[in-house]
C-alpha cells in the first residue's frame, strides 16, 4: 500500500504539511532544530519538482518553555498565552534559519477561528497564500494562541491545517505527529496494534479502532486527525498521516519506503 501513498504525494502539486508539537520537541521539551533543518531540506526537493508547500507549525508553547523553563509549570491561561507569544518568536526564528539555509524565504500567518468564518478575512488569507507561493515564499501558519479564547479557538492544528487546505484548494494534506499513522489500538501500549494504511470509509473506521487521548505536548490526537479528514475529503483533498520524527520522512513517503495512513477521496 506504500505505492498508494507514494502516488498521492507524487501527484500533488499544492501540499499543506502540518507538524505537531511532539515532532518539534525533543524528549527534554526543547526545540528539535535538527528536524527543522532536515524538513526544510526535504521541502526544497519538493519545491524543485514544481510543488508548492504551506507549513502549519505547532510548537509555540514548546518553544516558549525552551526559552523560559521556569514558566513550564504555570497553568494560568494568561501565562500560557504569554508563553506562546514568546515561543512564537523563537519558533519562527528557527524556521527562518532552517529555510534560509535552503535559499527559501518564509512568511508568517497567525490565524483564528474568526478569520475563517469571515468571508472578507478568509479571502485575504487565500490571496496572501497565493501571492507568497507565486513569489517562492513558504507560508508558515499557526493559530494565534496569544489572543484566542475558547469560543474563538480552532483548538488544534489538525483542524487548522484542514481549513487551510480547503481555503487554498490544496491537492494533499499531510499531518505529521509522533505515530506512523492510525492503528487499530494504541501502538505504544499494545504491541499487536496494526496500522490502517488506507481509509476509504471514515464512519467504518471509527467503528473499528480505539481512539485514545491527546498527546503530551499537543492539543490534538487521533480524534482531531479524523475530524480533519472528515473536513477535507468532502472537498476532494486526501489526507496522509505519518510519523514526522522518522529521518527523511517526506522523501521516504514519496519513494514508497515509509509507512502512513492515507484517507482517500472518491
Question: Where do the protein language model's features map onto the residues?
Answer:
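C-terminal catalytic "cap/lid" subdomain
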Residues: 2-73, 77-105, 109-266
